[in-house]
Every structure is written in structure tokens, then in C-alpha cells.
């Protein structure tokens, strides 16, 4: 109580307020960058459409029209292989014995060699020419020979037939032009070659220049094209052509798929990159089309994904052909995106945004003041050293920021703000509880209790959103928006606030008959706590806490515990009816606990119950702040998610009020019955 009333606390509050304004200004600038990049590119495999036409009794043009109407904007073109070139009737490739049989007059044919000829039309000749071009770079000159057979140019290749047929040659200009001719953008998917040469990289760029419809490059394999020596060169050439690199989001949604050189290339290109979501075929076959569409839609709106790479279902569904099945779920994604204010087209590339250093510096000072304020609440005797802590902290953090341009200091202060915000907010709530604890429930009544709890919830929520601005502002640059850098310490933001608010609580409310106000009191508290007799009821309670802890901690992050089906259904419902789905632990758990905590205070329920309800309130407020730690999520979406959580929590509070009223009446009824026995 004394800490909150001190002059130091008030000065720190002013410094925090100034820091919040600076962090808020950065967040608004960041929001403008995000809201200016709302075009999502839908990509599908070019050859998948070509190959499906014959087996579905459709022309290729009919299927291209089907996918165009579904919202597919771009066709993915991969490195050609000899096998694909034969399958699509561009080349003829023979084993030596077969070629000799077909050309008995030809001289010098070896059974161990491979022979390549074009299909005798303009397209075949073009593909043959490109194949010759690639083989001259990828194979030794001793292993490739060109000669005429009956007036047809022929390539003789010294290689093992089966391995050669699977050999990745490269991107073909003819394929790029063919894909673009159907009215789509083209996304190139090159792989790297061992000991890649500059000539090979230049040849790729030549193929890229074959069409002005190339919209992006998605590297495939474990390395980007040109790794290691020509990464910067290729990055520069792509930037010069204004062609972005697509980084594939990792399956666990943390960072990107492992690919040597991709992040270096992104930095070298001044962050001309887009985030791409790709679902594996193994994952897709486990889902129905509606759920698959929801996964893509949520990824786009919640994680700054601006390119979708769609796989094909394995089997057709609902009486449709396989192409119709695929087009159906892609159309669902496109429709929902457009309904949410996005456009479907060439992927937007975010501005390479870095906030003004002075604003960031002020936000850092505010976040530091928040940490110092929390220290003051936890350890009131340190109040005499508060300005020493503040000045020392400013010297260290500002020195690291301005002198070394340290990224770690930003991450540490963001973590500090995320941990300390719910602690300070709930400490203020506890201070209010202290002022009201002597009030009798008869003076309040259910109606006033609800209104009071509702006001407390919204005031607390607004303060938490203000504190969350520090996380958004301190980490608000393009590296974090693309998730090339991340918020560090997510698990700590769940656990530490609960431990810290417990320390604050035992200083304000009596456990075992007295509060903790000194070191001796704390030691006495620990001894009494360790001496508590363990009974069956306590074991049951600890079991319930263990389950809650598993759900709360285990379900956090991206690799959390599995989510049951009914909860997935609830999430999908909320996604459809609200702008941003609120978190269950906020509106079903933490926010209603405000009313229950006030009820426990006024009705003089056991102190331990009031404590656990305060912990629940802390979880709710902490979750609101932790939402902003996911920097890939747009700022506006995170902010509205918090407001939606408060709105849904207000409704849950009504349910909690009704439940408590029923419980009180039942308790009174059975208590009176028991008294008459």
C-alpha cells in the first residue's frame, strides 16, 4: 500500500505513461505498414493442373479457368527433370539399345549411353535447346556429345539411365512462358546444385526474364540457389527486378523451414520477402476441406502470411472431381479473405520498416520504469534505492541501444514489460480490494457487484493493453513483423507473473493470520506453509491445480498440448462471428474471475480461495499482454483480440454471476436443512 502511495511510484507512473505514448506511436506506424500490405497470392502447381486434365475428361484450359475462378493467382513452376520432359511429350529419351533398334543405320551407338531427341515441333525444339544448355553446365563435356541422326540433332549422354531421369536440370523458360500464357502469375521454385557456378545462377536469371509475369521465388530443398558463394549476387539481382523471396513458415509456426542461406538472402535484399504458408499433403489428408480452408485463412489474417501454396487432396470428395475438390477449398479461402478486407492478387511486400530511434529509446525508458515499479511493489524496502535502480538501468539499456545497437536489450525490455504489466495491474486491483474488504455483501448486492466487477475488468484490461504497447513498440520493426527475429521468453510470461503476484499478495493479505512484511515474516510463512497437513481434500485440490497448470502452460506456445474437437469447433465459431477470436483462458477463465474475486472478498470466503481467484485474474491479464508477443500478428488484430476478449469476458461474467447466485442459494438451503437436523 505504501509503495503505491509513494512519490516515487507516481513519478514512475508518469515515465511509464510517456513511454506508452512513444510505444503507441511506433505501433500506429507499424499498423500502417501492415494495413498497406493486404494482397494475398494463392499459388498452385502448374503441372498438377496439366496432368489432371486428361484423367478428368477436361481440357487444360477448362481446368485453368476453374482454378482462376477459385482464386488461384499464380502457378508454381519447378525444376524440370528428364522424366517430366518425356511425360509431357517435349523430348524423346532412349536407352542405347532401344535407340540403336530404332535407328539401325546410325553409327557409333553405345548400349550404355543415353540418347535424347526433341519432339518434332516448335515446342519440342525449344525444350531440347534448353536441355542442351543445362547439360553443358551440369555435366562434363566428355559426358555430353551432340550429333545428327537422320537429320535430327541428338544428344548422347554418359550416365546411369534411372538416375539421369530423376536429375533436376533447372527452370525452363518455355515452361515459364506456357504457365504465364494462361493469365496467371508465375512463381519459380528452383533448387540448388552442388558446387553451383555463377553461370548456372545467370542461366536461372535468364529463364526468369523470359516472362514479366514472374511474381516471386520460393526455393526448394535444404539450400537456396547459389548457396554459399552467390547468395548475395542472386539476392541483388532479384531485388533489382523487384521479385520477392518467399520464406516458408515452419510447421510449428516458429520461424521458417530450415534452408541454408534464406535469411542471409532476405537481409541482403533489404527484406523484400513475403511469408508463405504451405500445408503438407500428409497433413491435408487428415482434414476436411472446410478445416483446411480455415487453416489457410487464419494463417493469412493472424500471421502476416501473404502467399499460400496449396497442395492437392489425395482423393476427390463429395461427388466432385479431384480438381473441383481442390478448387472448392481454395475458393473458400479466397472468399473469406475478401470478406475480411484482403485482396487476392500478387503478394504484398511489407515496407522495410524500422521505427525512429528516438521513439524506441523513449519506449525503452518507459519499459524500464515499469520494471522498476514492479520491483518497488515486490520489495518495498528498495524504495530508497529506486532512483539508483532507474538511473543505472537507463545507463545500461540506453548505452547498449545507442552504442552497440543491441537487439537483445530490446528483447529483454519487451520480456520485462510482458511480465511486469499484469503484475502491476493486478497489484492495483489488490490495492482496491484492500480498501473494500471491510464492506459487507449486504451493502453491495448482486447488481452493484456486477457493475463494479465489470468496471474493474475493463479498467484493468485497458491498462494491460497500454502495457502491451511496450512489447509492440520495442519489437516493432520488419525483422519481427516477418518473424526473422522473435520475442524471447514466452513461457516466462506465463509463469513469472503468477509467482510475482503471489509475493505481492502475501504482503497485502494475511495467510496463517498475518501478512508478510519482512524477511522474518517470509521465513515464518514458508515454515508454516511447509508444515501444512496434507489431507485428501488438499491432494484433490493439488490434482486440479496440476490439470489447470498443464492446460495453462502446456497449451501455451506453438507446440502445446493437443486441442480437443469441441474446442476447435468453438474456435471456428468465434472466428466466424468476431473480428479476432479471443483466447479461452481470458474470457472463460481470467476475466470472470474478477467478479468471483470480488464476491470472495465481500462474502468473506476463505483467503486461499480469494488468492487462487487473483491468480486466475493475473492469468487473464497476462494473456492479453502475451498476445502482442506474437509479432507476426498484425497490431490491430492483437488489439481487437484483447477488446473482443473483454467483451466475451463480460458475457462470461454474467454466467459466473448467475452460477454464484445459484451456488449461494443452494448452500443456504442445505445449510438451513442441516441446522434443523
Predicted regions and their residues:
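Alpha-helical transmembrane segments of integral membrane proteins
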Residues: 2-22, 365-677
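A sequence-composition feature that detects small, non-aromatic residues
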Residues: 3, 8, 13, 22-23, ...
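Membrane-interface motif at the C-terminal end of an N-terminal transmembrane signal
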Residues: 18-38
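Soluble extramembrane regions of membrane proteins in the secretory/endomembrane system
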Residues: 31-357
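Glycan-processing catalytic domains of CAZymes
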Residues: 51, 64-72, 168, 175-190, ...
Amino acid at each position: 500500500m505504501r509503495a503505491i502511495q509513494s512519490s516515487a511510484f507516481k513519478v514512475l507512473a508518469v515515465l511509464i505513461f510517456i513511454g506508452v505514448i512513444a510505444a503507441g506511436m511506433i505501433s500506429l506506424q507499424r499498423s500502417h505498414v501492415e494495413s498497406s500490405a493486404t494482397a494475398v497470392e494463392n499459388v498452385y502447381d502448374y503441372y498438377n493442373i496439366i496432368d489432371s486434365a486428361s484423367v478428368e475428361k477436361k481440357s487444360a484450359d477448362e481446368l485453368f479457368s476453374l482454378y482462376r475462378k477459385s482464386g488461384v493467382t499464380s502457378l508454381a513452376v519447378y525444376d524440370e527433370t528428364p522424366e517430366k520432359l518425356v511425360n509431357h511429350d517435349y523430348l524423346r529419351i532412349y536407352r542405347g539399345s532401344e535407340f540403336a533398334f530404332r535407328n539401325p543405320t546410325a553409327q557409333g551407338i553405345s548400349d550404355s549411353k543415353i540418347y535424347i531427341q526433341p519432339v518434332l515441333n516448335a515446342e519440342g525444339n525449344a525444350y531440347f535447346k534448353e536441355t542442351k544448355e543445362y547439360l553443358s553446365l551440369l555435366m562434363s563435356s566428355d559426358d555430353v556429345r551432340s550429333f545428327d541422326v537422320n537429320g535430327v540433332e541428338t544428344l548422347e549422354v554418359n550416365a546411369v539411365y534411372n538416375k539421369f531421369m530423376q536429375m533436376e536440370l533447372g527452370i525452363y523458360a518455355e515452361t515459364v512462358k506456357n504457365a504465364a500464357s494462361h493469365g496467371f502469375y508465375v512463381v519459380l521454385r528452383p533448387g540448388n546444385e552442388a558446387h553451383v557456378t555463377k553461370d548456372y545462377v545467370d542461366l536461372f536469371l535468364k529463364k526468369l526474364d523470359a516472362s514479366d509475369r514472374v511474381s516471386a521465388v520460393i526455393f526448394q530443398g535444404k539450400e537456396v540457389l547459389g548457396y554459399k558463394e552467390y547468395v548475395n549476387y542472386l539476392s541483388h539481382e532479384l531485388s533489382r527486378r523487384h521479385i520477392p523471396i518467399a520464406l516458408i513458415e515452419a510447421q510449428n509456426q516458429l520461424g521458417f523451414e530450415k534452408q541454408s542461406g534464406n535469411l542471409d538472402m532476405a537481409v541482403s535484399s533489404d527484406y523484400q520477402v513475403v511469408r508463405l504458408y504451405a500445408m503438407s499433403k500428409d497433413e491435408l489428408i487428415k482434414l476436411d476441406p472446410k478445416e483446411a480452408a480455415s487453416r489457410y485463412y487464419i494463417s493469412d489474417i493472424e500471421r502476416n502470411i501473404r502467399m499460400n501454396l496449396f497442395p492437392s487432396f489425395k482423393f476427390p470428395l463429395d461427388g466432385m472431381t479431384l480438381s473441383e475438390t481442390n478448387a472448392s477449398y481454395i475458393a473458400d479461402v479466397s472468399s473469406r479473405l475478401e470478406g475480411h478486407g484482403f485482396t487476392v492478387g500478387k503478394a504484398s511486400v511489407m515496407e522495410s520498416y524500422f521505427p525512429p530511434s528516438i521513439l524506441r529509446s523513449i519506449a525503452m525508458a518507459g519499459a524500464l520504469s515499469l520494471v522498476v515499479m514492479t520491483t518497488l511493489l515486490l520489495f518495498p524496502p528498495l524504495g530508497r534505492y529506486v532512483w539508483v535502480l532507474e538511473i543505472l538501468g537507463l545507463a545500461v539499456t540506453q548505452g547498449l541501444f545507442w552504442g552497440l545497437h543491441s537487439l537483445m536489450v530490446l528483447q529483454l525490455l519487451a520480456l520485462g514489460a510482458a511480465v511486469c504489466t499484469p503484475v502491476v495491474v493486478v497489484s492495483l486491483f489488490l490495492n482496491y480490494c484492500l480498501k473494500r474488504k471491510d464492506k459487507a455483501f449486504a451493502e453491495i448486492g448482486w447488481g452493484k457487484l456486477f457493475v463494479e466487477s465489470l468496471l474493474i475488468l475493463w479498467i484493468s484490461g485497458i491498462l494491460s493493453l497500454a502495457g502491451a504497447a511496450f512489447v509492440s513498440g520495442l519489437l516493432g520493426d520488419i525483422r519481427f513483423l516477418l518473424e526473422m527475429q522473435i520475442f524471447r521468453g514466452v513461457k516466462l510470461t506465463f509463469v513469472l507473473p503468477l509467482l510475482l503476484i503471489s509475493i505481492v499478495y502475501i504482503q497485502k493479505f494475511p495467510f496463517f493470520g498475518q501478512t508478510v512484511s519482512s524477511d522474518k515474516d517470509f521465513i515464518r510463512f514458508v515454515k508454516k506453509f511447509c508444515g501444512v497437513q496434507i489431507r485428501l481434500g488438499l491432494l484433490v485440490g493439488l490434482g486440479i491445480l496440476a490439470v489447470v497448470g498443464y492446460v495453462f502452460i502446456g497449451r501455451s506456445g506453438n507446440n502445446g498440448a493437443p486441442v480437443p474437437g469441441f474446442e476447435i469447433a468453438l474456435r471456428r465459431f468465434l472466428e466466424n462471428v468476431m473480428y479476432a477470436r479471443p483466447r479461452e483462458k481470458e474470457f472463460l477463465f481470467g476475466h470472470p474471475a474478477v467478479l468471483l474475486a470480488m464476491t470472495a472478498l465481500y462474502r468473506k470466503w476463505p483467503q486461499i480461495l480469494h488468492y487462487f481467484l487473483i491468480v486466475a485474474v493475473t492469468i487473464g491479464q497476462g494473456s492479453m499482454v502475451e498476445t502482442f508477443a506474437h509479432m507476426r500478428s498484425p497490431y490491430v488484430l492483437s488489439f481487437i483480440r484483447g477488446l473482443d476478449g473483454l467483451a466475451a469476458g463480460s458475457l462470461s461474467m454474467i454466467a459466473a454471476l448467475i452460477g454464484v447466485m445459484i451456488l449461494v442459494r443452494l448452500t443456504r438451503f442445505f445449510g438451513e436443512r442441516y441446522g434443523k437436523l
